From Swiss-Prot:
GO annotation terms (biological process): tyrosine metabolic process
Keywords from the UniProt entry: Repeat, TPR repeat
Family the UniProt entry places it in: Belongs to the TTC36 family.
Entries under InterPro entries matching the protein: TPR-like_helical_dom_sf, TPR_rpt, TTC36
Highest rank taxon of the organism: Eukaryota
Stretches forming TPR repeats: 53-86, 88-119, 125-158
Protein name, entry field: Tetratricopeptide repeat protein 36 homolog
PROSITE patterns named in the record: TPR_REGION (PS50293)
Pfam families: TPR_8
Length: 185
C-alpha cells in the first residue's frame, strides 16, 4: 500500500487512535505499560509433582501437534493427576478445541482461569485468548470482547487484533480507509 501523507486534525487522529487502540485511554495521563507477550511467564512451585506434570504436559502438546488427540488427552489427564495446574487445563483445552469438543474446552478454560494465580500470567493470557475465540465462535461477542481485553492487557498482540476485528467502528473505518486508498491509486 502506498504511503499517503494525510493531514488529519488532532481530533481525527484521536478518533482513529481510539478505534484502533481501544484499550488505550486518550487522556493527558501517561499510558499504562502493557507487557510484551514474550515476556510473560508462569511461576510455579518447584516440586517433583509439578516437574513430572510439566514433562507429561509437554508430551501431551507434542501428541496434539502430531494430531493424536485421544492419546494427548490421556497424557494431559496423567499430568493433572500429578499436579492440578492451570497450564495443563489450558493446553488440554487447545487439544479439545482441535478435536471439535468446544464445550469441554470451554469448561477447561473456565477452570484454568479460576485456578491461575497472578503469577501465571502466560497461562492466563493464553486461556483468555482461547476462551475469547470460543465465545466469538459461539457469537457471544460481549464475552469474547471481555476475554480479549483481559488478554490484551496481559500483552497479547493477537487479542488486540481480535478487539479491532470485532469492533464495528473499526470495521467501518477500515472499509472507508480501503475505499479512500483505492481511489488514490
Amino acid at each position: 500500500m502506498p504511503q499517503v501523507n494525510l493531514k488529519l486534525s488532532s481530533h481525527d487522529r484521536q478518533v482513529l487512535e481510539s478505534i484502533f487502540n481501544p484499550l488505550e485511554l486518550s487522556s493527558t495521563q501517561p499510558s499504562v505499560s502493557v507487557p510484551c507477550e514474550s515476556e510473560l511467564a508462569d511461576v510455579e512451585p518447584d516440586t517433583e509433582a509439578v516437574r513430572s506434570s510439566r514433562e507429561l504436559e509437554l508430551q501431551g502438546v507434542l501428541l496434539t501437534e502430531k494430531g493424536s488427540f485421544d492419546e494427548a488427552l490421556k497424557v494431559f489427564q496423567l499430568a493433572l493427576n500429578q499436579a492440578q495446574r492451570a497450564s495443563v487445563l489450558n493446553n488440554r483445552a487447545q487439544t479439545l478445541r482441535l478435536a471439535k469438543r468446544d464445550g469441554e474446552a470451554l469448561d477447561d478454560l473456565n477452570k484454568a482461569l479460576e485456578m491461575a494465580s497472578d503469577q501465571q500470567s502466560r497461562t492466563k493470557c493464553h486461556a483468555h485468548c482461547q476462551r475469547g475465540v470460543l465465545y466469538r465462535k459461539l457469537d457471544n461477542l460481549d464475552a469474547a470482547r471481555s476475554d480479549f481485553e483481559a488478554a490484551a492487557q496481559l500483552g497479547s498482540k493477537f487479542a488486540r487484533e481480535q478487539l479491532v476485528e470485532i469492533n464495528p467502528f473499526a470495521a467501518l473505518c477500515n472499509q472507508m480507509l480501503r475505499k479512500a486508498f483505492d481511489q488514490l491509486q
